[in-house]
Amino acid sequence: MSSSGNNASVYGGDEINAIVLDSSSFHTRIGYAGDDFPKIITPSSYASPNEDAMELDNKKKNGKSKSSKIFGESINIPRSNHNVSPILKDSVIIDWEAAIEQYHYYFDDVLTLNYKEQPILITEPVWCTPQYRQTLLETFYENFDFPALFLAKSPTCISFQQGRPNCLVVDIGHDSVSVTPVIDGISLLKNSMKTNYGGQYLNDQIEDMLTHKFSGVNFENRYRIKSKTPTVYPEESKYTVRDLSENITQSFDDYQRQNIWHEFKETMLEVPEKKFNTSNTSQANSLKEIYSQDSNKRLFELPTGQSLELCLERFQLADSLFDPQSYKFNNPDLATKYPPSNGELSLTNSYDDYKPLKRARKAESNQSTPPPSDAKKPSSKTSQIRGLTHLITHTLSTIDIDLRSSVAHNIIVTGGVSLIPQLTERLYSELSNSNPGLKIRLHAVGNSSERFNQAWIGGSVLASLGTFHQMWVSKQEYEEAGAERILNQRFR
């Protein structure tokens, strides 16, 4: 096996500019280590022709085959017989062929990389299986000419971006909400938790609520609208439809309609000070009365030009991040997408989790931290559901008691959904009440672009450190040792 010391002479110089790749469910980010922001932010989806379009395309090309996948914002252009498909789900690649083509497109055609001179740092979520990590490693070593690479856990990157080696990373993303303790810059996998009550969960609630409350309204996609006249519901919408000769697929239409729910989420939702679903009836009624006042009314304009007035619903939907069981789906198909989740991960990693020195000394003295009060087996279906505050509180209770106060003082809130107004204020209030013995402190970057790209920025910081050159794992080392051995010895 080649030593890491040999890698230093090759990759340790200042002239080396590593590539940082951060792929998540909603967007993929690519750029250079040391930069403040990624060069490329692209959807983690692609468009491709279906069988009818492929047959017609092959006739035009006289049977010559060429990749027909479309990446970037171009997937939003209507095309006949083209489907839109995701590349990742839960920040994990589900379409390897499309992922490889997407990376090649941006590495070769957009950035025109010189592979021989640039190693790559790849971020990964903490819930990746050993089989997935091995496939990821083999894919990059076998399909690209990078001389070396490094796999970095996303929470670790975020901790570096904030300069907080001991912290709790709360990532409220598109497909999931995850809570991960980071100690000495290393993510503690066994203490991590994840639920699916994230951005897509809100999107589905928004779709369910709007289509049920405004059943007669036409939620037409923007690309179909030729002209429109502004109206306010219940006045009928006034618009003309564009004459489209293209045979638009259902997947493209569904993808475009998600943009409506996404825009609603970003512009209309606001977190209430307290949860609505409470046993205190007078408090619940008082809250509903407050958030039903005219000052809380907002108009949301649809692509058709028709505006919908909403008030209390804006707060009730956002409240479901903290209390997922508070929203009852009208559409059973949407409801089945979100079974009750307590956030506990069944990780089957083949390597031991990181153990801080304090934890080792404590074990030697036969002392133990009392189990968390909510760590017992749930007694009912509802007790299995953990909202945002409950998820964080439970994670804190599983951390070594000597480290708990340090972690509670450094809670990093990140992810695009965390930008919903008043979310951090509500979270601080509930965490302080739930953990009276801890001094809670939240750290949420004010710049929305920075918070949205925080994992990538952390990877950029990490890969540009002067001491990081010894961490790169060369392709030669991979060829000599194999993916499984490298994962166990170098990427623990």
Swiss-Prot record:
Recorded hits in SUPFAM superfamilies, A to Z, give: Actin-like ATPase domain
One GO biological process term is: chromatin remodeling
Q: Which SMART domains match?
A: ACTIN
Which top-rank group of organisms is this from? Eukaryota
The places in or outside the cell where this protein is found are:
Nucleus
GO CC annotations, alphabetized: Ino80 complex; NuA4 histone acetyltransferase complex; Swr1 complex
Q: What InterPro entries is this protein classified in?
A: Actin, Actin_CS, ATPase_NBD
Q: Does the keyword ATP-binding apply?
A: no
Entry-linked PROSITE patterns: ACTINS_2 (PS00432)
As one GO molecular function, the record gives:
chromatin binding
Region ranges (Disordered): 48-67, 331-350, 359-384
| Keywords carried by this UniProt record | Activator, Chromatin regulator, DNA damage, DNA repair, Nucleus, Transcription, Transcription regulation
**What Gene3D superfamilies would the database entry show?**
3.30.420.40, Actin, Chain A, domain 4
Provide the family line: Belongs to the actin family. ARP4 subfamily.
Q: How does it assemble?
A: Component of the NuA4 histone acetyltransferase complex, of the INO80 chromatin remodeling complex, and of the SWR1 chromatin remodeling complex.
Function statement: Chromatin interaction component of the NuA4 histone acetyltransferase complex which is involved in transcriptional activation of selected genes principally by acetylation of nucleosomal histone H4 and H2A. The NuA4 complex is also involved in DNA repair. Is required for NuA4 complex integrity. Component of the SWR1 complex which mediates the ATP-dependent exchange of histone H2A for the H2A variant HZT1 leading to transcriptional regulation of selected genes by chromatin remodeling. Component of the INO80 complex which remodels chromatin by shifting nucleosomes and is involved in DNA repair.
Please identify the protein, giving its name as recorded: Actin-related protein 4
Organism lineage: Eukaryota, Fungi, Dikarya, Ascomycota, Saccharomycotina
